[in-house]
Amino acid sequence: MILKSLVLAILVFLAWLAFSLGGALLNPALGSSLGSRFAEWARAHGASSIVNWSENEWYSHHSPPIGGALPRNAITVPSSSSSVATTQVPHLPTPAAIVPFASPAIPGEGEWSAVGRTVDGVPALYVTTLRPDAVHTSYVVGVAWMDMKLLSARLYSGSWIPGGGPYPFTAPVRSAQARTLVAAFNAGFLMNSANGGYYTNNKMEVPLRVGAASFVVYRNGTANVVAWGPSMKVTSNVVSVRQNLDLLVNDAKPVAGLNANDTIQWGATLGNSVYVWRSGLGVTSDGALVYVGGPGLNITDLANLLVRAGAVRAMELDINTDWVNYSYYAPSPLGLAGAANGRQLLNAMTGTPARYFESWWARDFITVSARKR
């Protein structure tokens, strides 16, 4: 009798495992590879510490190579007409070129190209590529600069991150929003790893933490990156607050202690000293948003890149290959943004510009769209 009960219990467990794990391995929202889907499933079932240890061990023994040349055409060379504004619509000045870390500079490195949908004929989005530092010269990262005089920001919420809902804005991007969409990009960590809160559209999904790095979207579509202060409140002017860890950049310089192995401050997943795919978001002194994303980055590299791109305050967003994605769209002037006219900031980014238009996409993300006049 005991043996039969044991066999039955094992069969029930195996059936559950096949259903649960099998469903996860078939779910594209958990990652592009079977390995990443298994890792997300394991984290959701109490094995976060094992997954984190395994990933740390892997990446610690597979650091990016030192030196070396870039693949052919890895650096985007801007066209001669990329920064010409054709109207007098109020907009920010074209950003100054980024001074590369590695010398000599490669032609086009750090120089901006206007891309994507224009706003009343004026470029609202500029992108560039450069090597992340003077040592790992076979890698390239992407930088996007967004003119928030021309663009409006929005936080889309997911059933996986932050969970809960329903939300007024969630994947897929609808036709009404696709008509003005310029770019979409990843947000932050899973909420149980973000060490911060989540507020959107009058709903406090996760309580906000004082001191946390916060991406704040206001009712007029402008956005900011700040440390959430003890006297700050969610007023009627605030639409969304997405927190993730602590500020990486403050007062236009990297914050102190970035090399400290503090998994609470900089995130338990992969730690802070491992070179992996990372992304970050900052705000410039004149209100533009800057996004940085790419491979082979540690937390210090990411902060240095954000400062070099002009950020006065900045925060880390999501990390790891499957989650770092920035896509921009170039439809006809009155057309809808979509996969067919989308392009990624870096060709090596996992996923495609279609992910934000898929109903299965379950993580939160950020969009910038042409501002209504």
Residue ranges and their predicted role:
Residues 290-292, 299-338:
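C-terminal soluble interaction/assembly domains
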